[in-house]
Amino acid sequence: HKGDRAQYKDCTYEFTQAFNLASVLGTKNEVRIESPFNDWFKWDICKTGLNYSVPFESTHSCYLGQEPPCGRCSTDIERIEAFYRNGVKDPKYSDEEWKKAVKHMQEVLKEFNNRVK
């Protein structure tokens, strides 16, 4: 998604195009790589998932592999923000854990925004 490009090179258009070219050449055009969410923010992807009733309780993002999610790694922060911006609690968290996760996410984003000013 859009927020990952600077951090992860496999989220760039260039990577997708190169991978797609290799796939097309290697499979005689039988396999194509699509990346429909490249221009979307995570909260936009979350909104679409909510509209399609994606079972988010069955999805996992935490880089530390924790269950419930750690709420501290970068992907958890983005996931928390995505659900928060959509006015929905991430089903991976209890009500109490969600309050703490949102508070931490807001602190992290505030600190980040202060650094980039």
Predicted feature residues:
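Nucleotide-activated chemistry modules centered on ATP-dependent adenylation/adenylyltransferase
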Residues: H1-K117
